[in-house]
């Protein structure tokens, strides 16, 4: 039973799945000898098991130490693993255990002090400080070799502690030099041109067959396949059909004996391929035929976006059967979905030269994708066609996104039975009607231009959100308004996954205005780690492209913190991640505007953790300037709480240039006891 339970714990799994085996070991009440036989197993569990299981293993190893059955080398091995974990409770307990061991046998310091130094790299500066105090308390004047090893590990300390360690251990490589600080930001997203020229029939068939078997096609792949199918159909539909038939032979609709396929069951390139092979009835593709949506309710923007992409694919498939197009107008210039205005003007010119009538949905999609450049409007107007006139109007003020309104509400979306949910107070954005879309676009596009509120009911199948970004790749603000309810659900509820959409949205074009900044602020407080990481990616992308308004983002975070939409501890985790990439100055510039919200009306829970991240940023980048509102009273509080300690640390960092500031609160001397 003992061996089986321990082996099951070593295999890992969710905490709930492991609880039975830890409880069984408690019931079995192992003797000291039985525990000692599995020392290596306890160390492995303390290193890698889920936090509750690791805590049990740590307690078992502590009991072995108290019984004199845990040698110094085993304790060092255990400590190096545990001190690497992020859980502060486990790290704090391990440092206490190391302190006991060092007081029991000072001769083991050459083994235990290097293990203690593993905590120098922990994100929590208080734990770094505790480890440094422990080293200072037990390091002897003659320990030159040990001091050299510890100095190497001290490079991982925060700037203020690194200066203290330098006085204790001697020279430390790469000391912090605020005068030489350089912000590290990611490179701006690279754009790849989307080209379809020169692709053979065989390459087209191979691409279409691959996309028919996946639900994770990129915008680049889908748009390339659509345009290739249209181009080759116009040149030689018979030859294209001959290439497609063997590649798609395993598709049920491709068999000759199945009759016409149902277009509701096909999408994108596969729908066009079915048209090329003659498996679709033109009557089923008529514009007036209803499209089965993937959402529910008139307020579901995801359903509206899906209907737009479906309508364009059906339109192209119908033209394959009736009046083939030479190429598509809306094929993007870049992999992100953006269409350059000059490319669209060139395509419209070619259409006019060949007497080709543009497909309405394809042209409307092209307008939504085109980069807004007023200088190209004159060229568009010179085409002297209806499409040229509409393009010229779209490139100027008529096509500009409608400004949104902002307010705070506690009313949730209407339920399907007509009621309305009560929800925590939160910020909502509302869009007015976009008159140009309502007047000049086909009916299927009209929902994109209707007034939209975040309190409308929205239910839809997931999985197409990333593809929908390419419908409006030059309007991040409108898409951010649509995305905000999902991000708010990630912050105040159990929702997850919207952060990935946000990180991709930040890479698109168009203004990065208040809506996008509010979306990033909301996602920084998401419940789930992956959504917060995606929000950090979005923040860094905006910073790298010079579009991040740190003051605006800080004010949004302050409001969200006061409303309770964003929790301080979650924001601290996200900010710590952003700073760890090297963006200390950017992160501090954002936090400077957010901190008053957790300090002015009485310190909020988690404020100390947020202050610690802010202090880290200031110490690394050497920022100065006025103290955030509420910091001085927090720093004046008595006691050693994390809030007071970190407030004093931040105040000191802001008031004193890091190159000359002294760590007044922490003064260490060799052999000092009581740490």
Residue locations for each model-derived region?
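Alpha-helical structural signal with a strong bias for long, charge-/Ser/Thr/Gly-rich
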Residues: 1-78, 82, 90-92, 96-114, ...
């Amino acid at each position: 039973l003992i061996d089986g339970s321990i082996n099951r714990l070593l295999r890992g799994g969710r905490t709930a799945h492991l609880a039975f085996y830890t409880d069984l070991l408690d019931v079995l009440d192992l003797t000291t000898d039985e525990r000692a036989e599995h020392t290596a197993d306890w160390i492995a569990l303390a290193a890698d098991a889920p936090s509750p299981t690791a805590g049990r293993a740590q307690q078992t190893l502590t009991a072995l130490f108290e019984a004199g059955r845990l040698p110094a080398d085993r304790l060092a091995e255990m400590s190096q693993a545990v001190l690497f974990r992020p859980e502060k409770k486990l790290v704090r307990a391990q440092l206490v255990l190391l302190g006991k061991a060092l007081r029991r046998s000072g001769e083991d310091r050459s083994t235990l002090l290097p293990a203690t130094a593993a905590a120098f790299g922990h994100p929590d500066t208080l734990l770094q400080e505790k480890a440094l105090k422990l080293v200072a308390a037990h390091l002897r004047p003659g320990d030159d070799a040990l001091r050299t090893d510890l100095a190497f590990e001290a490079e991982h300390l925060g700037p203020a502690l690194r200066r203290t360690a330098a006085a204790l251990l001697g020279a430390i490589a790469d000391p912090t030099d605020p005068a030489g600080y350089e912000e590290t930001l990611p490179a701006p997203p690279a754009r790849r041109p989307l080209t379809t020229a020169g692709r053979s029939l065989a390459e087209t068939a191979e691409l279409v067959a691959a996309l028919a078997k996946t639900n994770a096609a990129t915008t680049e792949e889908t748009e390339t396949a659509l345009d290739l199918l249209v181009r080759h159909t116009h040149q030689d539909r018979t030859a294209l059909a001959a290439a497609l038939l063997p590649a798609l032979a395993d598709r049920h609709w491709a068999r000759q004996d199945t009759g016409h396929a149902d277009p509701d069951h096909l999408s994108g390139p596969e729908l066009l391929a079915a048209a090329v092979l003659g498996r679709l009835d033109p009557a089923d593709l008529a514009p007036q035929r209803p499209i089965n949506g993937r959402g529910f309710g008139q307020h579901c923007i995801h359903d509206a976006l899906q209907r737009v992409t479906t309508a364009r694919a059906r339109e192209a498939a119908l033209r394959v059967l009736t009046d083939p197009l030479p190429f598509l107008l809306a094929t993007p210039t870049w992999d992100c979905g953006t269409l350059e205005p000059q490319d669209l003007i060139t395509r419209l010119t070619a259409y006019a030269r060949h007497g080709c009538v543009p497909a309405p949905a394809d042209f409307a999609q092209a307008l939504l994708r085109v980069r807004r450049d007023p200088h190209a409007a004159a060229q568009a107007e010179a085409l002297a066609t209806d499409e040229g006139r509409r393009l010229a109007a779209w490139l100027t003020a008529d096509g500009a996104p409608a400004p949104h309104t902002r307010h705070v509400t506690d009313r949730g979306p209407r339920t399907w039975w007509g009621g309305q949910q009560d929800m925590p107070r939160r910020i909502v954005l509302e869009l007015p009607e976009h008159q140009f879309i309502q007047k000049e676009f086909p009916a299927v596009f009209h929902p994109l231009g209707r007034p939209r509120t975040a309190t409308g009911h929205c239910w839809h199948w997931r999985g197409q959100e990333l593809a929908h970004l390419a419908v409006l790749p030059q309007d991040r603000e409108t898409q951010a308004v649509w995305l905000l309810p999902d991000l708010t659900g990630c912050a105040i509820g159990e929702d997850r996954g919207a952060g990935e959409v946000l990180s991709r949205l930040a890479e698109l074009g168009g203004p990065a205005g208040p809506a996008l900044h509010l979306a990033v602020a909301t996602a920084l407080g998401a419940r789930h780690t992956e959504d917060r990481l995606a929000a950090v990616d979005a923040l860094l992308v905006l910073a790298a492209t010079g579009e991040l308004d740190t003051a605006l983002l800080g004010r949004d975070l302050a409001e969200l913190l006061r409303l309770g939409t964003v929790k301080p501890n979650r924001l601290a985790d996200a900010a710590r991640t952003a700073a760890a990439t090297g963006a200390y100055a950017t992160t501090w510039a954002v936090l400077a505007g957010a901190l008053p919200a957790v300090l002015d009306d009485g310190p909020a829970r988690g404020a100390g953790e947020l202050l610690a991240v802010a202090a880290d940023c200031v110490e690394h980048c050497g920022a100065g300037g006025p103290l955030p509102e509420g910091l001085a009273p927090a720093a004046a509080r008595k006691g050693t709480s994390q809030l007071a300690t970190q407030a004093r640390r931040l105040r000191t960092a802001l008031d004193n240039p890091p190159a000359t500031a002294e760590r007044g609160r922490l003064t260490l001397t060799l052999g000092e006891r009581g740490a």
